[in-house]
Design a protein with these regions (language model features):
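Hydrophobic alpha-helical packing residues
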Residues: 147, 177, 260-263, 344
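Core domains of carbohydrate- and sulfate-ester-processing enzymes
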Residues: 58-86, 192-282, 382-395
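The substrate-binding groove and active-site-proximal loops of carbohydrate-active enzymes
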Residues: 91-111, 143-157, 266-294, 312-321, ...
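Active-site-proximal helices and loops of the catalytic beta/alpha 8
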Residues: 164-170, 181-182, 191-197, 210-230, ...
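Structured alpha-helical segments in the cores of large, soluble enzyme domains
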Residues: 291-307
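N-terminal structural segment of carbohydrate-active enzymes
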Residues: 1-173, 183, 188-192, 204, ...
């Protein structure tokens, strides 16, 4: 008689597969679009990542351009050779820090990067990837206060444009970090601390809830009208993009603050809410038309304005935590750029095979390669590194 064997996955990274009589584990078959074209300039790029505040201080005049960090937290100016304040230091004897881990600044800026371009090029680098440079309270800048403005501690808009012009002279490219899943609680969009002229979501809804909680007979609609009148009387302005409606803020106080949805529970990073609407038939950031216009659709949108200022593309932070339809639209909008085809790079940590159809990202951060290298260099695990790399080869077509 005939012998029947099934061949399937052996559940090991880079393994050879296995046979069984029945119920073999399924293996992945990668499907991709052979006409999927990515920017040619990126294919031979050697990329150098820079955390701007710690790279080089090229202009000491901008070191004092801000007086506070998040809320009323002070800004700490550290000496270049000092260690940043961090929880490990807090456990040491004689610790004298403030136990705030993101308010110490060392003065690195765009001018500093520009002054070191000869050195950077001597390493064979032709593309820079900068961690976020938009106006933000922290030193890491993943808590945007204003997406459209460069942080004054990094430089001015004119300095940034001069920087990108110099890069183009050198045939170099610039990738910026786009953090569009969340913002800072100290921002023009949220304004938890009441610092900005534009009405932010937290000051708006906290005022509404305060009125409702102080007067149980007051309807939500009346509280909204009273809040609008109050804020306008104070000289506040409502953004035409409706910042005050971008977030989920509830009438429930937790630790003295009205509860809101935040990235991984960090209250400094309120998340853009997904809502029902017409763009897609489920809750999505794309259905928030004002937000989508602001980030990508408008002629002077965040994504387009930075490209117009000389950037070559975007690395999209926590890309898998934003609706994929949002990124499909993002791609359509940016790929119409006539000056140069911009790069769209997703922060994806695991297998990215599902993105090979050419309608989302041009590529992703190669963290799987990173993991294999760290495993080998730190732990000396050559076999483990080989298995991880073989798994990448299996998943990604050449």
């Amino acid at each position: 008689g005939e012998a029947l064997k099934e061949y399937g996955e052996d559940t090991q990274e880079g393994g050879q597969g296995s046979t069984s009589d029945t119920n073999a584990s399924l293996f992945q078959m990668t499907v991709y679009d052979p006409s999927y074209k990515t920017p040619d300039w990126m294919k031979e790029s050697v990329v150098y990542q820079i955390f701007p505040d710690r790279f080089f201080n090229g202009n000491k005049k901008n070191d004092d351009s801000k007086t506070t960090a998040r809320g009323t937290e002070p800004i700490e100016h550290q000496e270049w050779g000092e260690l940043p304040d961090n929880p490990r230091l807090a456990e040491t004897e004689g610790y004298s820090g403030d136990e705030i881990w993101s308010n110490d600044f060392f003065g690195g800026d765009i001018a500093g990067v520009q002054k070191k371009l000869d050195y950077i090029q001597s390493l064979g680098v032709n593309t820079l990837y900068l961690n976020p440079i938009a106006y933000a309270s922290s030193n890491h800048k993943y808590d945007a206060a204003d997406f459209k403005a460069i942080d004054p501690m990094f430089g001015t808009p004119e300095e940034f444009k001069n920087f990108t012009k110099e890069l183009k002279k050198r045939k170099m490219h610039l990738i910026l970090d786009g953090v569009f899943n969340h913002v800072g609680d100290d921002s023009i969009y949220f304004d938890r601390y009441g610092k900005y002229e534009t009405v932010g979501a937290y000051e708006y809804w906290s005022s509404i809830y305060n009125l409702m909680n102080d007067n149980s007979d007051l309807t939500k609609e009346d509280a909204i009208e009273q809040t609008k009148e109050k804020l306008l009387a104070e000289g506040q302005k409502f953004s035409t993009y409706g910042f005050h409606n971008w977030f989920n803020i509830e009438n429930e106080i937790v630790n003295g603050v009205y509860k809101y949805q935040a990235w991984w529970g960090f209250d400094s990073l309120p998340e853009i809410k997904s809502v029902p609407g017409e763009a897609v038939d489920y809750d999505s950031e794309l259905n928030n038309k004002d937000f989508a216009d602001y980030i990508m659709y408008d002629k002077n949108s965040v994504a387009k304005s930075w490209l117009d200022s000389g950037a070559s593309g975007w690395r999209l932070d926590v890309a898998n935590e934003v609706d994929t339809e949002f990124w499909r639209e993002f791609r359509k909008e940016l790929k119409t750029n006539e000056k140069e085809e911009p790069l769209i790079l997703g922060e994806i940590w695991d297998d990215a095979s599902e993105y090979f159809l050419g309608d989302l990202y041009d590529s992703v951060m190669n963290y799987r390669f990173r993991g294999a290298m760290i495993d080998y260099l730190k732990n000396g695990n050559a076999k483990g590194a080989e298995d991880q790399l073989n798994a990448v080869f299996e998943d990604y077509p050449q």
